[in-house]
Amino acid sequence: MAKLVFISFLVASFCLIGCFGGEAEIKQFWLVRKNAIFQFRFATVEIEKTIYQKVKHILVKAKDDDQKNCIDGVKSEAIIESRAIVKGTVGKILPAIDEVSEALRTGDENKLKAFNNNWNYPEYKVKELANFKLKAAALAPTVQEKLDKCVA
């Protein structure tokens, strides 16, 4: 009798895992999506904060409208470049996430399986965050140099 109960328990467990195993993958994907969007937004804020701090500091030194216009132009270029950096590093995964999200909303789980096969998110996150930090650190002196030329 005990063996029959144990075997029934095992069969029921495997059935539950089979039924809800995909559900765990879906929940994990939504957590990855949430984290990827957070990382993208956080990186955007960090790099733009650096630019705005540099602009604010140099704007005090501007004496006429030509210098202020030059500073504004440098700021605009830096913001465009910073967004390209963010999209090229921590934001590379977002188009794939959007595609899978849309597929899951319609009930198609095939894109999720392809996403899981193509992306190792923890590894990607570490690698691209380090890459982002390097590129953001390289952008700051370039922006500062251009801003200094505006008020020279």
Swiss-Prot record:
Disulfide bonds join C70-C150. Residues 1-21 form the signal peptide. Expressed by the venom gland (posterior main gland) (at protein level). Keywords: Disulfide bond, Secreted, Signal. It is found in: Secreted. GO terms for cellular component: extracellular region. Coiled coil: none annotated. Belongs to the insect vpf1 family. This is Venom protein family 1 protein 2. It comes from Platymeris rhadamanthus (Red spot assassin bug).
